[in-house]
Amino acid sequence: MAKLVFIRHGQSEWNLSNQFTGWVDVNLSEEGVRQAQNAGALLKKEGILFDQAYTSVLTRAIKTLHYALEGSDQLWIPETKSWRLNERHYGALQGQNKAEAAEKWGDEQVHIWRRSYDTLPPLLDASDEGSAANDRRYAHLDPKAIPGGENLKVTLERVIPFWEDEIAPKLIDGQNIIVAAHGNSLRALTKYIENISDEDIMDVEMATGEPVVYDLDENLNVVSKKKLN
């Protein structure tokens, strides 16, 4: 039996200012740091010993992982960063205040962009200075792999190959894994491992800085799930 822990990054500066973040690399807020440190204390109390850690290439998730591992006295364990664990790319909405976007396009349209499983947001052009194509952390990628915007369906298609190739084999081998990532990349993984429908996943929320602990059998079926708070 292997343990799998998901942690959505602690509150970010743009969570605090109510902005669409996506692939923009913003930092944790002071509250976000506190949440990540608290996650570490909860994991230490739970007594979970990890073999491997995974996170995205975005600062808010990386720092959350480090605070959580430091708090549970496991900062030394092997760590892998992957762009495939990044947040959903919000396209041209990135950087915009959510309330102002609702005023511009209407509450219903913005709600559809945020919550529909397969509706894309307005796309960010590759020539835009804010495009990830201009960020050297993605220089190794085929430019065609860099999205201009994603829905949850596309995010799932991005995340699952990494799960299948990197994370699942270690869990099958009995290793305990921690994944510190983002609301939508973790919702995508949650949908996959819990076999949640396209409709029901839209109601699943990932709280910032809250560890979610799974016990998985040798076939990666969920035996138990609990949230630490």
UniProtKB/Swiss-Prot annotation:
Keywords: Gluconeogenesis, Glycolysis, Isomerase. Pathway: Carbohydrate degradation; glycolysis; pyruvate from D-glyceraldehyde 3-phosphate: step 3/5. The active site is at H9, E87. One of its GO terms (molecular function) is phosphoglycerate mutase activity. Substrate binds at residues 8-15, 21-22, 60, 87-90, 98, 114-115, 183-184. NCBIfam families: pgm_1, PRK14115.1, PRK14116.1. Belongs to the phosphoglycerate mutase family. BPG-dependent PGAM subfamily. This is 2,3-bisphosphoglycerate-dependent phosphoglycerate mutase 2. It comes from Latilactobacillus sakei subsp. sakei (strain 23K) (Lactobacillus sakei subsp. sakei). The gene is gpmA2.
